[in-house]
Structures are given as structure tokens and as C-alpha cells.
Amino acid sequence: MTAEPPVVLERRDETRNMARFYVISVEPTLFGQWAVVRHWGRLGTSGQSRESWFADLDAARAESAGWQRRKRGRGYRSHTVKPAERPSVLV
């Protein structure tokens, strides 16, 4: 049981003063379940987070894929995270 690398999405629109991030990861829990951890907010802030727990990895991956699809549909794009840029929430 290992965690999958997080998916980091960003949405920027200077005309609307918008700079947002959305991080989605699938991680094992201490109880043998899987958690989809979502972390979001304005770039430069600590943001908010929420966890959803699932009994099996396939269900957690499906939930993660659903959130990624919704966010990409709203204009979020992939952001490549270099180790030096990683937000503290990902370390």
C-alpha cells in the first residue's frame, strides 16, 4: 500500500484576479482503507482540505478521477511541481 503522487491543478485568470490551486491525492489510511485528499485555495494561502475514505483502491481512484474531470472542465490545468516548489501540505 503506497500513496500515489498528487495531481496539482491551477487556474489563473489575471483579468478576474484569479489564482487558484487544487491538489488531489489518493493515500492509504492507518485502518487499511484509502483516502482521497483534496486541498484547495488561492495561490499563496494555506487553503482548505477535505478527506473522503473508501474501502478499496479502485473506488478511491474513481473518485479522484471524477474530481480531476470536474476541475479540468472548469478551467484548471495541470501544474508540474518541482521539489523546491512543493507546498508544505505535500511534504
Descriptions of predicted regions:
Residues I24-E51, A65, R77, P83:
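Short aromatic-glycine-(Arg/Gly/Cys) micro-motifs in beta-strand/loop hairpins
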Residues M1-A35:
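Short N-terminal "domain-start" leader segments
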Residues M1, R11-T15, W40-G41, R72-R74, ...:
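A broad, low-specificity signal for short, low-complexity segments enriched in glycine/proline
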Residues S46, F54-G73:
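A short, charged, amphipathic alpha-helix used as a generic interaction element across diverse proteins
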Residues M1-P6, S78-V91:
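Intrinsically disordered, low-complexity and often Lys/Arg-enriched segments
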Residues R50, A62, R86-L90:
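Alpha-helix boundary/capping detector
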